[in-house]
Amino acid sequence: MIEEEVLKIIKPTEEDKKGIEKVLEIIRERLNKLDFEVEGSFRKGTWLRQDTDIDVFVFYPKDVGKEYLERNALNDIINRIKDLDYTLAYAEHPYVIVNINNVEVDIVPALRVESGDKAITAVDRTPFHTKYVTSHLDERGKDEVRLLKRFMKGIGVYGAELKVQGFSGYATELLIIYYGNFRKVLEEASKWKHPIKIELTKPMKIFSEPLIIPDPVDPKRNVTAAVSLKNIATFSIAAKYYLKNPSIEFFFPSKKVEEKVKGDVLILRLNLDEKSSEDIVWGQIKRSVNKIERALKQYGFRVIDVQAWGDTNNITIAVQLESKNIGQYYLNIGPQYYSETIEDFIQKNDNIWVGEDGRLYSIKERKEYDAETIAKKNIVLKVKYNIESYWLQNKEDQQIMKFLRKTPTWLK
């Protein structure tokens, strides 16, 4: 059975666990006498082999407040691990990423609260998530979570960060707890029609998102609030097709795809000079993508697709048009002859005539008819960046090939 084959690949071995424990020993020595806990998928036993980020949370009394975490707590942690290979990262508040033996350890300051619904920062709920999941999943259930995570990774809908807008690890765990196993999740997801409500606990507020899973440890929060409708639809379609024709392609899609260039494709390569929070950068990138598409349509271009990909430092925006060539002039459709606005139209326009339909028309010059210029003007990044732009001529990297192909390999 395909699921058993996949599990052999993704389930960590005893050797893998020992390697992680060695890394954790180094961290434990550094954080000695602090109130800290290992959290995340490693602690819950739902982590994937060769895909390990360890989450270590350092807790401080809730009375010290959020500002304390950003300054004092962060400095306290840095002073203890400064001899290790570390970088600063940014979410709701800064945290530290330590790299030991190619294993990333996220060390996150948090506030110690009595229950998940008393959380002051988003990460304060984490130990309650861990407790809930470990008390509701047996060993087989953990393997079912692993299958669901790998399936979602394979089809590109895993990850709650703004760049992806997909399912978090916690969401996959709750789906398995609710439905029972991987296959049952797919069977139900294949029939989804939004709004979808999955209630392990009664919600404490009304949610408006397309997929609603109230958090069992904080029912005022929707665990899947960040999941986009596009990713819900993709998951539902993938579930339907996998159940019809199971294939390892869903879990590990082919990396090499070939596709010819259709239409005209503008490639914008952005290199960011400054480090910033991934969610902040990708919030601005997503706004840029929407703005570029709207602006091009307003100027008369027929837009096929606009997408972005990359990390926090190097980002590619691809713009696919039916054609990059557009006339310098365009037909401006005016009011009917009996309209009260005809004088205003005549005053503001040249080359005016009355059409056979009794409507006024004019010829107008476009303010801008170069797609590359329009696209560049509508990038709204607030950090400094360098840009390289060109029209695609030849087949390039696989991400561009995926953009051109559109159809995921698991679908066709």
UniProtKB/Swiss-Prot annotation:
Acyltransferase keyword on record: no
Keyword terms of this UniProt record: ATP-binding, Magnesium, Metal-binding, Nucleotide-binding, Nucleotidyltransferase, RNA repair, RNA-binding, Transferase, tRNA processing
Enzyme class: transferase
Note: A single active site specifically recognizes both ATP and CTP and is responsible for their addition.
Quaternary data: Homodimer.
Family stated for the protein in its record: Belongs to the tRNA nucleotidyltransferase/poly(A) polymerase family. Archaeal CCA-adding enzyme subfamily.
Function: Catalyzes the addition and repair of the essential 3'-terminal CCA sequence in tRNAs without using a nucleic acid template. Adds these three nucleotides in the order of C, C, and A to the tRNA nucleotide-73, using CTP and ATP as substrates and producing inorganic pyrophosphate. tRNA 3'-terminal CCA addition is required both for tRNA processing and repair. Also involved in tRNA surveillance by mediating tandem CCA addition to generate a CCACCA at the 3' terminus of unstable tRNAs. While stable tRNAs receive only 3'-terminal CCA, unstable tRNAs are marked with CCACCA and rapidly degraded.
Protein's name in the database: CCA-adding enzyme
Species: Saccharolobus islandicus (strain Y.N.15.51 / Yellowstone #2) (Sulfolobus islandicus)
High-level lineage: Archaea, Thermoproteota, Thermoprotei, Sulfolobales, Sulfolobaceae
